[in-house]
Structures are given as C-alpha cells and as structure tokens.
Amino acid sequence: MERGRDRLHLRRTTEQHVPEIEVQVKRRRTASLSNQECHLYPRRSQQQQIPVVDFQAELRQAFLAETPRGG
C-alpha cells in the first residue's frame, strides 16, 4: 500500500511541475526575443536611455487614432 501511495504522490507532483516548465519556456522565448531586438539597435542607443513612458503614450495615441470614436 505504501508503495502505491508513493507512486500516486509522484505522479501528482510531476503533473504539477509540467505547467511551471511551460511557463519557463515561454519566459525564455520572450527573453530571447527582447535580446534580439536589443541587438538590432546600435549600442549607442542603449547608452541614451529612451524614455519608455513617451513610447507608451505614442502607442496609446496611435491606438486611439485607429479606433473609431464612440464605438
């Protein structure tokens, strides 16, 4: 009985760990993508830190311009 219970417990723990691995893989993918994007731009632009807030504001304005008003 003890052995069967241990096996069940093992199976449960492995099932719980599967989604964590998937999340790590997704994180790695996004990290590698952002690394590639960084390599596209010259090092100089990394030194002058581009304000992220302005970029988000521009995105919001573009999004608002594309979406029909009152819809």
From Swiss-Prot:
Single GO MF descriptor: ATPase binding
InterPro entries: SNURF (IPR009847)
One Pfam family matching this protein: SNURF
Recorded GO CC terms: nuclear speck; nucleus
UniProt keyword terms in alphabetical order: Nucleus
Cellular location(s): Nucleus
Family per similarity comment: Belongs to the SNURF family.
Any further remark recorded for this protein: Encoded on a bicistronic transcript that code for two proteins, SNRPN and SNURF.
Name of this protein: SNRPN upstream reading frame protein
Organism (species): Rattus norvegicus (Rat)
Organismal lineage: Eukaryota, Metazoa, Chordata, Craniata, Vertebrata
UniProt gene name: Snurf
